[in-house]
Design a protein with these regions (language model features):
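Peripheral (often C-terminal) accessory segments that flank ATP-dependent C-N-forming ligase machineries
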Residues: 57-195
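A short beta-strand motif that forms the metal-chelation/ATP-contact edge
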Residues: 25-35
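Conserved protein-kinase catalytic-loop segment immediately C-terminal to the catalytic Asp
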Residues: 17-21
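Coil-to-beta-strand transition motifs
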Residues: 11, 22-27
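Short coil/turn motifs at secondary-structure junctions
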Residues: 23, 37-39, 143
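Active-site "cap" helix and flanking loop/linker of ATP-utilizing ligase/carboxylase catalytic domains
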Residues: 1-16, 33-94
Length: 195
């Protein structure tokens, strides 16, 4: 809120990207984009029952987004899990095979899975530009934070991917993270993800 007030941002969607430095327990803002981060749009619907894209359009047209209909929320907490490899010389977990994808869909019907398997120059470019390779994203909802955490860990295990927030010795001291917010509607119960 202090940051948004300092830049004069009063309402609307924004995407705040920051670094967390565990050496001094400090957040450092990288950038603030005054727009909807589309990666997170389904999380708002899961938790608040709002269509974030319709809200953004309504705001752009100068209308009140509170007048839009809401759907019944399906979760009290939601997360966008971003799976990254930080060792350019290490192994990257393979993309889930069809049986794993089908098992994920059966066990977690609300899951959204994005797989970004890259090899060779594509992966090398990721490491050169970002210091990591994003090989997947999973969106899930849960009854509460604990249920969400358990579902995230179970889904990660099913896919053969380490849960991104657990210490596997592969995360750098600084972890890039981003989280969605609706400044005019209050904070959603959406988890920021190591991403």
């Amino acid at each position: 809120q202090r940051f948004l007030g300092a830049i004069g941002y009063a309402h609307g969607f924004f995407n705040l990207e920051f670094f967390y430095d565990d050496h001094d327990d400090c957040l450092r803002v990288i950038e603030c984009n005054p727009r909807l981060a589309s990666q997170f749009s389904d999380l708002y619907e899961r938790v608040h029952g709002v269509d974030a894209h319709a809200m953004a359009l309504t705001l752009a047209l100068g209308a009140d987004p509170q007048s839009l209909p809401r759907v019944r929320p399906t979760a009290r907490a939601a997360a966008s899990l971003v799976y990254r490899a930080f060792d350019a010389n290490g192994d990257v977990p393979p993309a889930p095979a069809v049986p794993q994808r089908e098992a994920l869909a059966r066990r977690f019907p609300d899951a959204l899975l994005f797989s970004f398997a890259k090899m060779g120059r594509g992966r090398a470019r990721d490491f050169r530009w970002t210091g990591s390779h994003r090989y997947g994203i999973v969106h899930l909802g849960g009854r509460d934070r604990e249920d969400l955490r358990q579902r995230c860990e179970d889904a990660s295990e099913l896919l053969g991917w380490p849960a991104p927030y657990l210490d596997h010795g592969s995360l750098p001291a600084r972890v890039h993270a981003s989280a969605p917010s609706l400044s005019s509607l209050g904070e959603p119960s959406v988890e920021a993800s190591a991403g």
